[in-house]
Amino acid sequence: MTLYRNLLLLASLGLSYAAPSKVQRAPDSSLHARAVCTPTAGGDSSTDDVPAITEALSSCGNGGTIVFPEGSTYYLNSVLDLGNCSNCDIQVEGLLKFASDTDYWSGRTAMISVSDVDGLKLRSLTGSGVIDGNGQDAWDLFASDSSYSRPTLLYITGGSNLEISGLRQKNPPNVFNSVKGGATNVVFSNLKMDANSKSDNPPKNTDGFDIGESTYVTITEVTVVNDDDCVALKPSSNYVTVDTISCTGSHGISVGSLGKSSDDSVKNIYVTGATMINSTKAAGIKTYPSGGDHGTSTVSNVTFTDFTVDNSDYAFQIQSCYGEDDDYCEENPGNAKLTDIVVSSFSGTTSDKYDPVVANIDCGSDGTCGISISGFDVKAPSGKSEVLCANTPSDLGVTCTSGASG
């Protein structure tokens, strides 16, 4: 009888496993449309619209959308802090115009501050959005007082998964975009950037991109007109890709400067599809020499490929005596460690400034010069193509002429 009861129990359990009850899942009622906010513009430059934008960020900054409509103008007379954004989408289809108040901006780091933000999209979907740094007064003041400290237009420090796209950025008092503080996964795409002075004073120090301590930064489909580095790869930049960029009037795409007062490194850089117009150089590396308070510079796994040179002074340049004169560097030679530097597929014509020289490769005698060059088809206006070299490897890939400096 006991055995019969046990068999009956097992049978009932087996039946239970064979025909489990179905669980019906109701639709998730917690999914909501993104909150959308449109800040109220004050209407003229006497009203600072930053408080209204900050209020919109408080309401919609956590996963919502903030819209600046096409045809609208917002006057920003103070720093715009986007710290309240978390996975928010800021769509600039109108004009954000900063005040030119040189007293207010003196010594400030940023006009737009993005500090430890995750998931920001700052973009224009229509391509009509403009961020105007209104930097003319700052350039004019700096021309007479080089100690005047000017802010960066967009300053990113820390954070991750940031997208800046589709916008026009114009006339920053200083640098256009800066990335540092360990930021990661930052994408700049489809940007038009220009700094044009209406006076005889040039838009000094208007780097397009200063990329410092960060990883996985991408710059793609960008046009820059400025008066300093188009892209500056600063200390501790790592895994940076620049793909399809046009730079006019710049100091080129530069690694550095490095080693001014500490040991600095830049590594894992890939630059391709660059058109360099009226630049002091198309691409290059700038390192301080040894001695004094200078540190050691390490540059590794850097590729410059598919460059078109149009009236730029040098196609490629390495400076191992940056920031010092020749006498200093005779006593304190360059000690930068350059490894796996690839320069390939350069074409075009330089300016006549250094004709017949098209490149100046001055590696430090106390460092390493791991550089290879291939597909280098750049000529001076005379039709000649002379490359000045110092302390370069025998298998560099181009015919060298002695006399490199810098």
Swiss-Prot record:
<feature type="repeat" description="PbH1 3">
    <location>
        <begin position="266"/>
        <end position="289"/>
    </location>
</feature>
<keyword id="KW-0677">Repeat</keyword>
<keyword id="KW-0119">Carbohydrate metabolism</keyword>
<keyword id="KW-0326">Glycosidase</keyword>
<dbReference type="InterPro" id="IPR011050">
    <property type="entry name" value="Pectin_lyase_fold/virulence"/>
</dbReference>
<dbReference type="GO" id="GO:0004650">
    <property type="term" value="F:polygalacturonase activity"/>
</dbReference>
<feature type="repeat" description="PbH1 5">
    <location>
        <begin position="333"/>
        <end position="375"/>
    </location>
</feature>
<dbReference type="Pfam" id="PF00295">
    <property type="entry name" value="Glyco_hydro_28"/>
</dbReference>
<protein>
    <recommendedName>
        <fullName>Probable endo-xylogalacturonan hydrolase A</fullName>
        <ecNumber>3.2.1.-</ecNumber>
    </recommendedName>
</protein>
<dbReference type="GO" id="GO:0045490">
    <property type="term" value="P:pectin catabolic process"/>
</dbReference>
<feature type="glycosylation site" description="N-linked (GlcNAc...) asparagine">
    <location>
        <position position="278"/>
    </location>
</feature>
<feature type="glycosylation site" description="N-linked (GlcNAc...) asparagine">
    <location>
        <position position="301"/>
    </location>
</feature>
<dbReference type="GO" id="GO:0071555">
    <property type="term" value="P:cell wall organization"/>
</dbReference>
<feature type="signal peptide">
    <location>
        <begin position="1"/>
        <end position="18"/>
    </location>
</feature>
<keyword id="KW-0964">Secreted</keyword>
<feature type="active site">
    <location>
        <position position="251"/>
    </location>
</feature>
<comment type="function">
    <text>Pectinolytic enzyme involved in the degradation of xylogalacturonan (xga), a galacturonan backbone heavily substituted with xylose, and which is one important component of the hairy regions of pectin. Activity requires a galacturonic acid backbone substituted with xylose.</text>
</comment>
<feature type="repeat" description="PbH1 1">
    <location>
        <begin position="183"/>
        <end position="213"/>
    </location>
</feature>
<dbReference type="InterPro" id="IPR012334">
    <property type="entry name" value="Pectin_lyas_fold"/>
</dbReference>
<feature type="repeat" description="PbH1 2">
    <location>
        <begin position="214"/>
        <end position="235"/>
    </location>
</feature>
<keyword id="KW-0961">Cell wall biogenesis/degradation</keyword>
<feature type="active site" description="Proton donor">
    <location>
        <position position="228"/>
    </location>
</feature>
<comment type="similarity">
    <text>Belongs to the glycosyl hydrolase 28 family.</text>
</comment>
<keyword id="KW-0325">Glycoprotein</keyword>
<keyword id="KW-0378">Hydrolase</keyword>
<keyword id="KW-0624">Polysaccharide degradation</keyword>
<dbReference type="InterPro" id="IPR000743">
    <property type="entry name" value="Glyco_hydro_28"/>
</dbReference>
<keyword id="KW-0732">Signal</keyword>
<dbReference type="GO" id="GO:0005576">
    <property type="term" value="C:extracellular region"/>
</dbReference>
<feature type="glycosylation site" description="N-linked (GlcNAc...) asparagine">
    <location>
        <position position="84"/>
    </location>
</feature>
<feature type="repeat" description="PbH1 4">
    <location>
        <begin position="299"/>
        <end position="320"/>
    </location>
</feature>
<dbReference type="InterPro" id="IPR006626">
    <property type="entry name" value="PbH1"/>
</dbReference>
